[in-house]
Amino acid sequence: VRMCDGSSAPICRSVSDDGYHFRKDRSFSFHLSARYTGASARDPKIVPDGSGLYHMFVTTSLAGEKKGCLAHLISEDAERWEEVEPIYVAPGRDEPECSDYLEKDGWYYLIFSLRGKGQYRYSRKPFSDWQTPDNPEIPCQSVPKQAVWNGRIIFAGYRGNGAYAGTMTFAEAFVGSDGQLCFRK
């Protein structure tokens, strides 16, 4: 939710018993701290880390620095969330949107859309030390999402054609020896 009146946007959730039909959980809601520009908080992404800890990434900005970022929160139960250092801080005001996350062959990938272009960062560590690749753009244009299917990394995004959504785009990614992704459309 992005708040047009400047008030802090709540982080909410929906729940499902079957993964198909969802209902709003009206008992769950929280706000980011004043460290962040609360009105722009949106696009939460939750990632389990294998040790029982959940990580949430939220699109926002650092209030004092006026830099876009992905706030990083952690939880042991997906109910109570604690803010830690942002997982990514953009070089300017643009906010990294619609984040995604991938582990493949011992490399970790943080995926997001910045200024309408899909981008990624990579690391040997799951939640820090992000490197910018030689070419950070994902050739799926906006809002790239990935899935590992039969061992293959498939990205889907869209070409907006002047509006939101539009033509769906796909690309397959391969992990290079240095961890950078190589793409084939």
What are these regions (language model features)?
Residues 1-185:
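Carbohydrate-active catalytic/glycan-binding domains of CAZyme proteins
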